């Protein structure tokens, strides 16, 4: 059952009724996306933007990064701008914002008018009928909508940080395997030279067939390892390519050697504590639990 408030106006305050009608029919939009992307840029140190595929300036930036020797930061920046999965997640933020704004809207009041005549006089009355229960629940709906938006916001942040971590892991894995590939190529060359030398020594009668077989087996073993590593590098290149948002092969190249380990790496327990405090998915769950408690 709905409760309604009924306001009666005479000719003198008809203007007031019109103002009330206008005020109830519109809700100002909130520019939350710009605030969100600026906040996320500070946290991640990467440019965050949606619909980058429709922004020529951002596409030029991506092409410029691809033309240079690809660093881990460049790969992450491309992924944040170009990954279609992340772009879809950004749309969830827009939906949550729309739900939040919708929660603040009141049903449009009903305008009633009547003309009374009697005793030679004509009397005009204007009335506005408003859903009173909806009016009372509006603050609660707005608060709930904001809390749900904050939960979605934390989940979106979690997706951004997860993508950054995934791209960084893929980049360093590829970089390490490419470095191993270079090493295996040198080993294969050395093993092939040793095999050819052993063949000449065997032909001259200086070594046994068993020694020759050992050299041949060693060559084929390292050759197989090289082929397997080449396949693995191609797979990892494709994985990183897709994480950066590309569906077809791109002619990018990464740096060849892994960075040196820092001597000032934080201890594991400190990393675990920091991760627990800052994980965005946990922050989203905390917001949802708080809403349920209230």
For each predicted feature, which ranges?
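A glycine-/polar-enriched beta->alpha junction
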Residues: 81-88, 94-109, 126-144, 153-161, ...
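Membrane-embedded beta-strand positions in outer-membrane beta-barrel channels/transporters
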Residues: 76, 112, 125-127, 171, ...
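Terminal intrinsically disordered/low-complexity segments used for targeting and assembly
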Residues: 2-81, 230-274
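Short, glycine/charge-rich beta-strand/loop segments that flank catalytic centers
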Residues: 96, 108-118, 169, 176
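Periplasmic alpha-helical coiled-coil/stalk elements that build and connect Gram-negative outer-membrane
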Residues: 154, 158-274
């Amino acid at each position: 059952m709905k409760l309604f408030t009924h306001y009666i106006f005479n000719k003198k305050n008809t203007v007031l009724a019109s103002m009330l009608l206008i005020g109830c029919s519109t809700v100002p939009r909130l520019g939350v996306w710009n605030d969100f992307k600026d906040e996320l840029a500070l946290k991640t140190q990467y440019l965050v933007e949606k619909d980058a595929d429709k922004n020529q300036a951002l596409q030029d930036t991506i092409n410029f990064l691809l033309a240079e020797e690809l660093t881990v930061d460049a790969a992450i920046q491309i992924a944040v701008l170009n990954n279609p999965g992340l772009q879809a997640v950004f749309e969830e933020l827009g939906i949550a914002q729309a739900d939040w704004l919708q929660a603040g809207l009141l049903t449009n009041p009903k305008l009633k008018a009547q003309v009374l005549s009697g005793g030679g006089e004509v009397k005009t009355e204007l009335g506005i009928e408003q859903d009173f229960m909806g009016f009372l629940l509006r603050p609660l709906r707005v608060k709930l909508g904001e809390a749900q938006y904050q939960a979605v916001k934390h989940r979106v942040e979690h997706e951004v940080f997860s993508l950054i971590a995934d791209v960084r892991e893929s980049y360093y894995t590829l970089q390490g395997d490419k470095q191993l590939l270079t090493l295996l190529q040198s080993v294969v060359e050395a093993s092939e030279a040793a095999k050819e030398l052993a063949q000449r020594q065997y032909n001259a009668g200086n070594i046994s067939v068993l020694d020759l077989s050992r050299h041949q087996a060693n060559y084929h073993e390292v050759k197989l390892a090289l082929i397997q590593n080449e396949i693995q590098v191609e797979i990892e290149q494709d994985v990183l390519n897709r994480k950066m948002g590309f569906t077809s092969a791109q002619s990018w190249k990464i740096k060849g050697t892994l960075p040196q380990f820092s001597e000032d790496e934080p201890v594991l327990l400190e990393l675990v504590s920091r991760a627990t405090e800052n994980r965005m998915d946990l922050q989203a769950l905390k917001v949802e639990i708080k809403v349920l408690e209230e």
